[in-house]
């Protein structure tokens, strides 16, 4: 039973302002935030470089980074790369990117995860985008792993597991996989 949950048609929209709340049937658990009250999302503050000045947002602490190895592990059309920011405008007007990484993109892209929020100014970082803890896609992938790796897993179990994985891949506009594509338990 789905209990009223269903995958969002847009992967990225649920990580943007207005993409959370009761209107998003994929979200099982998100922490509601409100910068006018006493709760907010600090993620932008932790990931934005100190010289960031793009999409109406400015600077952060840059405590968390990603790697180019991780970024390159995604398929070319994978929508999940959307908020792995590979280029941005710096406060001095220069463009920082993989070819011109400066200090901030030398290791890898910015793991923004959540969309742009013009309320994030300076290293105060108070965003109104609700942090997502658990969503239906997580349930599908957890169930797929359990079915595929359970002791004495049957071919029917593995086919069901792959169908759950492909449901997520289809939403991400990726090609479907089959059992030959799963070669390790990792």
Where do the language-model regions lie?
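Acidic/polar-rich alpha-helix caps and helix-coil junctions
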Residues: 1-41, 76-186
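Short, cationic low-complexity segments
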Residues: 48-68
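Non-catalytic, low-structured ubiquitin/UBL-interacting segments
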Residues: 71
């Amino acid at each position: 039973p789905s209990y009223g949950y269903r995958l969002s048609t847009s992967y990225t929209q649920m990580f943007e302002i207005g993409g959370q709340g009761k209107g998003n049937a994929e979200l099982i658990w998100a922490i509601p935030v409100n910068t006018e009250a006493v709760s907010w999302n600090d993620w932008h503050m932790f990931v934005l470089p100190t010289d960031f000045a793009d999409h109406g947002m400015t600077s952060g602490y840059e405590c968390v980074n990603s790697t180019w190895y991780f970024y390159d592990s995604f398929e070319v059309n994978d929508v999940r790369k959307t908020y792995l920011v590979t280029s941005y405008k710096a406060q001095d007007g220069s463009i920082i990117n993989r070819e011109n990484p400066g200090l901030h993109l030398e290791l890898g892209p910015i793991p923004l995860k959540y969309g742009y929020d013009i309320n994030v100014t300076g290293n105060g970082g108070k965003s109104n985008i609700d942090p997502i803890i658990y969503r239906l896609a997580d349930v599908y992938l957890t169930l797929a792993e359990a079915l595929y790796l359970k002791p004495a897993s049957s071919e029917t179990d593995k086919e069901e597991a792959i169908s759950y994985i492909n449901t997520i891949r289809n939403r991400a506009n990726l090609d479907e996989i089959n059992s030959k594509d799963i070669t390790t338990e990792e």
